[in-house]
Amino acid sequence: KTLTLDAKPQLKISGTSSLHDWDMVSETATGKLVGTTEGNKLTAITSLVVEMPAESIKSGKGGMDKNAYKALKTSQYKTVKFDLKAAAKNTDGTWNFTGTFTISGVTKSVTLKIKETIIGGQSVFEGSYSFKLTDYKITPPTALMGTVKTGDDVKISFTLKFK
């Protein structure tokens, strides 16, 4: 069975700076999941790809967005992508996803623990991925002539609904 990502995913990137903690949010992504179902429950997932336009991430502050897009090299790398390689369902109903994240043209293998709930016949996946910007060859952005520095540690949190 093929499921499609709902039109309004919730994707949040959180980090720190020398001035304050920050969040950037996107509600724009595309995705497809191929799996086996029993009733309305997924029993196996054979394929899952989610892509988010890099410039859909917004902080609500234009200057911060511009610095982030420059650091992410969005003029060259248009998307952030997750590509599933293997999925294992745990006895507690969670999943272990093994796959790759591609950010700023750099691809890294990741393992994610994902919580799945069924709401209104939709599979809702919630999880997060913490990483260092420098792992993806991203120089943490600075602002105000280098006086405000972004921390290297960031976290992507997501809620994805497939139907």
Language-model features: locations:
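Low-complexity, acidic/polar, glycine-enriched regions of mature
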Residues: 1-163
